[in-house]
A protein has these predicted regions:
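Internal nucleotide-binding/catalytic subdomain
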Residues: 153-294
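A conserved helix-loop-beta module that forms one wall/lid of the active-site cleft
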Residues: 92-152
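ATP-binding N-terminal substructure of ATP-dependent carboxylate-amine bond-forming enzymes
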Residues: 1-94
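Generic C-terminus detector
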Residues: 368-373, 377-425
Length: 425
């Protein structure tokens, strides 16, 4: 069969790499893809938001399955457009992708169906938001309602910071219309854990837990980013936590969406905070995380295409989801110095060939492209996800950091403390 993957990041590279292992698949296309993805797929120069062109391409090439990796096209309704044309596509429809597309929607859903989350208020009027802050307890969290590349969440320590945050999101419109409405919620303490799951509209099957590192600098300092590294599984995601979440969060979310007439098919990413009062939902994403996909998919033992098809057909109950639970994976992001603010790109990348033929070592491309001389060069803030698998997290971490030294480019930057929490577990 022929598969089209929509997106251009490390997540899509991990998906394409996994799809390439399927015995059912004989041709993979990726739109727009990147230099790394071109090793396993034919990259085509169509943007992820060019729905008409993507549909035309899928028809022309007789694509059997399209997989949407990114949040923007999902929230924009790409699945509805494909389905209307009779094309098979993996991902939630527009009315279900709102779970990620609107923070206010997801918070109201959790409140209505008693899914544990932080206390919150929503605002469309900046004056009312500022008024509310005057009596609120600090620190406090401000979230842009819409998509903001994972950067629309501000943690404010003081009232001044919080007021400045309202100005940034709602008045200066730093993230455009994403800040037309904001959620102000209580600051929760605890460890963050990400849990990825497959959903077929009726039931949910959990993949694995992972732990992200959102801040740009060591010691969780600096600005929020799309993620600077990850490890899986999380040692803090215990059997007790799993049982609680299965009882009160995972299936409850799928049931809530179904009850609202918005059945969800695809991947739900549960962003959880393990608070002293039990696990609570921080956020939902309507697709694989990036770099969560890079640490979870190497341990998936099923044919991923079978799982995608089961989600589309509502037959996920017939799939026995298998993970290599005897192995752990760590991913360290190599970024362009200056990310997530300003950075230069176009620098040649050396050392990629060192990953060839090495078991347990992977390099997933995020921001790369070929220059006019056919050289692979940097093309984004997050450039590569250097990933390694080991018998435990300690070994995987050691290997991943060892492998970061194989790669060089002019403004290479990384955090040196990805997975440091493993030692505290």
């Amino acid at each position: 069969m022929k598969v089209l993957i929509v997106g251009s990041g490390g997540r899509e590279h991990a998906i394409a790499w996994k799809v390439a292992q399927s015995k059912k698949v004989d041709k993979i296309y990726c739109a727009p893809g990147n230099a790394g993805i071109s090793e396993v797929a034919e990259c085509v120069p169509i943007g992820a938001m060019e729905f008409d062109k993507l549909v035309a391409f899928a028809k022309e090439k007789e694509i059997d399955l399209t997989v949407i990796g990114m949040d923007d096209p999902l929230v924009g309704g790409i699945v509805d457009v494909f389905e209307k044309e009779g094309l098979r596509v993996f991902g939630p429809r527009k009315n279900a992708a709102i779970l990620e597309g609107s923070k206010a929607f997801s918070k109201d859903l959790m409140k209505k169906y008693n899914i544990p989350t932080a206390a919150y208020e929503t605002f469309t009027d900046p004056e009312k938001a500022l008024e509310y802050l005057e009596t609120a307890k600090m620190p406090i969290v401000l979230k842009a309602d819409g998509l903001a590349l994972g950067k629309g969440v501000l943690i404010c320590q003081t009232l001044e910071e919080a007021k400045e945050g309202v100005k940034t999101l709602m008045m200066d419109k730093k993230f455009g219309s994403a800040g037309d409405e904001i959620v102000i919620e209580e600051f929760m303490t605890g460890r963050e854990v990400s849990v990825l799951s497959f959903v077929d509209g009726n039931i949910v099957k959990i993949m694995s837990s992972a732990q992200d590192h959102k801040r740009a600098k060591d010691g969780d300092q600096g600005l929020n980013t799309g993620g600077m590294g990850n490890f899986s599984p999380s040692p803090f995601y215990t059997k007790e936590v799993d049982e609680f979440c299965k009882k009160y969060i995972y299936q409850a979310t799928v049931d809530a969406m179904k009850a609202e007439g918005r059945p969800f098919k695809g991947v739900i990413f549960f962003g959880l905070m393990l608070t002293p009062y039990g696990p609570k939902v921080l956020e939902y994403n309507a697709r694989f995380g990036d770099p969560e996909a890079q640490v979870v998919l190497p341990r998936l033992e099923n044919d991923i295409v079978d799982v995608f098809e089961a989600c589309i057909d509502g037959t996920l109950d017939q799939v026995d989801l298998k993970f290599d639970n005897d192995r752990a994976t760590v991913c360290v992001i190599l970024a362009s110095d200056g990310y997530p603010v300003e950075y230069k790109k176009g620098f040649p990348i050396e050392g990629l060939e060192k990953f060839k033929g090495k078991d347990d070592y992977y390099v997933f491309h995020s921001g790369t492209k070929f220059n006019e001389n056919g050289q692979i060069v940097t093309n984004g803030g997050r450039v590569l996800g250097v990933t390694a698998t080991g018998k435990d997290l300690k070994e995987a971490r050691k290997k991943a950091y060892e492998a970061t030294e194989w790669i060089s480019f002019e403004n290479k930057y990384m955090r040196h403390d990805i997975g440091k929490a493993i030692e505290e577990a």
